From Swiss-Prot:
The keyword ATP-binding does not apply. Disulfide bonds: none annotated. This is Mitochondrial intermediate peptidase. GO terms for cellular component: mitochondrial matrix. GO terms for biological process: peptide metabolic process; protein processing involved in protein targeting to mitochondrion. Its EC number is 3.4.24.59. Keywords: Hydrolase, Metal-binding, Metalloprotease, Mitochondrion, Protease, Transit peptide, Zinc.
């Protein structure tokens, strides 16, 4: 019933024209380090009082200059925040988070609130009370997710170990209670009673009805309707699946930890890297390492590459056994819940595909549309091999990376200027917003029509012990809070020792965090965090943080998720922001990668950090051509992997003799143009995505196809500056992005793409999407 927002990449004018402070006509002189001061105070705990957000968004040259400089130059930021003033507040403005144990207090108070809501739902008996059940259950979910989502973020990103530890404890206590609720028959029965009464449902909005169906499905997946002993087994299985999945990823290992070869066999590899691995004339190459990947691309000796390939594609027997055990556990869980397979269980809820059969239609159509290009690329690789071996008529599995690297090499040389792209992408240029502190820059997102609409925290720079993986975290979803709830929370506050924490019912109902007013109700604003690992700007202030083109794409990708969270400000948090169909969640972020490479978009911000010269677009075009080389073969590999994921979560997982490795090899032979893995290898033991993305791996491909289609249809593939058209952006916003999970995603797509064939979804629609293909023309 209750779930956290999971997503284990700068605003564009088409989203909010006012959120992008557009560059005025650039001055001829180079950019200089600015000096600017304003009122701001930071305290020792890292929490701060930002300057008051504006309710409008003027687009001025001075604002553009200031906002870029806040990110580009450390000295500017020190001046910007050095003037005393303001009252220290909690982290994210949460009034509980003013000291290290604050997260524990927040969890305790939230659990108390949650229990009160549970009691209210269980006691409902009148039509009036039943009419409020969906809103009450959504509020219950929000109370718990406020803690879970925030604690999850803090425990993996905050630099203070004590705060991390307390966040972990808070998360564990609330997560345990959430699992109790998900199998609570009373809540399920009360919801079912409400949904079955026409006098109740007649007053529900369409969004409310959607939320009710989502909650009902969540209860069904938790086996809440089963007898007690089966519910107990369900909880036991769920716990074991979680533990085995984590162990599978953490303990993943190759059968052979190190490949030992004579140093003479590694001709072609970077001699410095090879020398570092050499002892007494032998090279000791770690099997799962960057050096092994490099060797497969560069070592001339085919036998040496063969040894490395076998080792890097053969997981340990224990890893494979853990995979098999995980699949059997999931199969049992699905059977216990009344589903034919785990795939049927996983795809029924919050998925566009709805069934394994529909996914199969998509993947089969996609592999067919991709095959001609993949075969062409294989022919190019074979022709390259035949230059050295004229008599050969086939490629070995360890040839693909080697010969594709040879073909790419001239592109890399021609695009050597691509290494200079970072000179045009300083971090302060793409981002817009208001304030920050040393670890987190706080940005207020302001709309020219709706005022203050979201809060965005950017933790973008590298630091010791920080995760290198880019991520988007939803710390709090949008939700509408009515006067009756505010009065209730305010009364509870007055009766407790929290009386002095909040100055109004609105602040008490939002834990002191940011909200917007809508008549008699308020909306808690989406609060989002973006985490990256970009290089720091120069401490001397002479050079801003410079991004490679890949890092720029990453930033745009993660901001795509943030855009979705900002636009989908629904009344119910259950369907807010990225809480949409799982196989739609990557569409906005993947789409943003097209904007990152668009000439008109780059022209808005990409200038040399020293000379202020605009970016020569040919440099980006060269980089894009290099990246897309052999794209079809890469896509084919992902298709086969997605098919493998579906097969693992099919009824076959519960059959005797279930053999994941044999299934994988058979799929390669049937659907791949590339040579299949040889017998004796066991790559499935390395398929770590199975832990968190079981049965939904196809989503990456699905959203890539959809993103390409949206770019081509809605934004006219960027022709005639269509990427900067507000009209185009408004269409995507109104048809798809603003709904979150509150509307049938197929109807959203049909409206966005002006294609009625998609409106009803199903297997035919999935096959149609697959037929569009996912590779871009070169």
């Amino acid at each position: 019933m209750i779930r956290t927002v999971t997503r284990p990449r700068q605003w564009q004018r088409w989203v909010y024209s006012s959120c992008l402070l557009q560059r005025a006509v650039p001055p001829a002189a180079a950019r200089q380090q600015p000096r600017f001061t304003t009122s701001h105070k930071a305290n020792h705990f890292g929490y701060h009082q930002p300057i008051a957000p504006v309710t409008h968004a003027p687009i001025t040259r001075e604002d553009d200059f200031v906002l870029r400089s806040v990110f580009d130059y450390p000295q500017f930021w020190q001046d910007f925040t050095s003037v005393p003033g303001g009252i220290p507040v909690g982290l994210f403005r949460n009034s509980f988070l003013k000291e290290p144990r604050g997260m524990l207090t927040f969890a305790y108070v939230s659990l108390k609130k949650a229990r009160a809501v549970v009691a209210k739902v269980l006691a409902a008996s009148s039509v009036t009370e039943y009419r409020l059940i969906v809103r009450d259950l959504d509020r219950l979910s929000d109370i718990l997710c406020r803690v879970l989502d925030m604690a999850d973020f803090v425990r993996v990103t905050h630099p203070d170990p004590e705060i991390q530890q307390n966040a972990s404890k808070a998360w564990e206590s609330v997560y345990e209670y959430m699992n109790e609720l998900n199998t609570m028959t009373g809540l399920h029965d009360q919801l079912a009673t409400a949904m079955a009464n026409p006098d109740v449902t007649v007053v529900w909005s369409e969004e409310e009805k959607t939320v009710a169906e989502v909650l009902k499905l969540d209860f069904t997946k938790s086996a809440v309707s089963l007898p007690q002993k089966y519910r107990d087994r369900f909880v036991q299985l769920s716990s074991e699946i979680s533990a085995v999945g984590s162990a599978f990823v953490q303990e993943m290992a190759p059968e052979q930890e190190t490949v030992v070869l004579p140093s003479s066999d590694l001709r072609g590899m970077d001699p410095v890297r090879a020398r570092d691995l050499t002892r007494r004339g032998k090279v000791y190459l770690p099997t799962l390492s960057g050096e092994a990947v490099m060797a497969l691309r560069t070592v001339h000796d085919a036998d040496a590459r063969k040894h490395i390939f076998y080792a890097s594609r053969t997981a340990s027997r224990r890893s494979v056994q853990m995979l098999e055990y995980l699949m059997r556990l999931r199969s049992e869980l699905a059977s216990l819940s009344g589903f034919e397979s785990y795939g049927h269980l996983a795809l029924r809820d919050r998925m566009m595909a709805k069934s394994p059969e529909a996914v199969d239609q998509f993947l089969r159509a996609l592999v067919e549309s991709n095959r001609p290009k993949a075969m062409q690329e294989m022919a190019e690789l074979l022709a390259e091999k035949q230059k050295a071996y004229p008599q050969t008529n086939s490629l070995d599995p360890w040839d693909k990376d080697y010969y594709s690297d040879i073909i790419r090499r001239p592109l890399r040389v021609a695009g050597r200027q691509g290494d200079l792209l970072s000179s045009y992408f300083s971090l302060g240029v793409p981002l817009v917003g208001e304030t920050w502190h040393p670890d987190v820059r706080r940005l207020d997102v302001v709309s020219d029509t709706d005022g203050h609409v979201a809060v965005l925290y950017c933790d973008l720079f590298t630091r010791p012990n920080k995760s290198p993986n880019p991520a988007h975290f939803t710390l709090r979803c949008s939700r509408e809070i009515f006067a009756s709830e505010m009065e209730e929370v305010w009364e509870q506050t007055q009766q407790s020792n929290q009386k002095s924490m909040f100055g109004s019912p609105e602040l008490a109902a939002t834990d002191g965090m940011t909200f917007s007013r809508h008549g008699d109700s308020i909306k808690q604003l989406p609060t989002i965090a973006l985490v990256c690992d970009f290089p720091q700007p120069s401490k001397h202030g002479d050079q801003p943080a410079l991004l490679s083109f890949l890092q720029l794409e990453t930033l745009f990708h993660e901001m795509g998720h943030a855009i979705h969270s900002v636009l989908a400000r629904t009344s119910f948090q259950t369907v807010a922001g990225t809480r949409c169909a799982t196989d739609l969640a990557e569409l906005p972020s993947t789409l943003m990668e097209f904007f990152a490479a668009d000439a008109a978009v780059l022209g808005q911000f990409a200038r040399h950090h020293e000379t202020n010269e605009p970016l020569p677009y040919r440099m980006v075009a060269q980089k894009a051509r290099q990246t897309r080389r052999f794209e079809a073969l890469d896509t084919e590999n992902q298709i086969v992997t997605a098919m493998f994921d579906q097969a693992l979560h099919s009824p076959r997982a519960g059959e005797p003799g279930f053999d994941p490795t044999a299934i994988f090899h058979a799929l390669q032979r049937t659907h791949s143009c590339a040579p299949p893995d040889p017998p004796g290898t066991s790559w499935p033991g390395f398929f770590g995505h199975l832990s968190g993305y079981g049965s939904v791996y196809y989503s990456y491909l699905f959203d890539r196809v959809l993103a390409q289609r949206v770019w081509d249809v809605v934004f006219k593939a960027g022709e005639r500056r269509a990427a900067l058209s507000r009209e185009n952006g408004e269409k995507l916003k109104q048809s798809l992005l603003k709904w979150g999970g509150a509307r049938d995603p197929w109807k959203c797509l049909a409206e966005a793409l002006d294609d009625d064939r998609l409106a009803e979804g199903g297997e035919e629609a999935m096959a149609l999407v697959g037929s569009w293909g996912s590779t871009k023309p070169r």
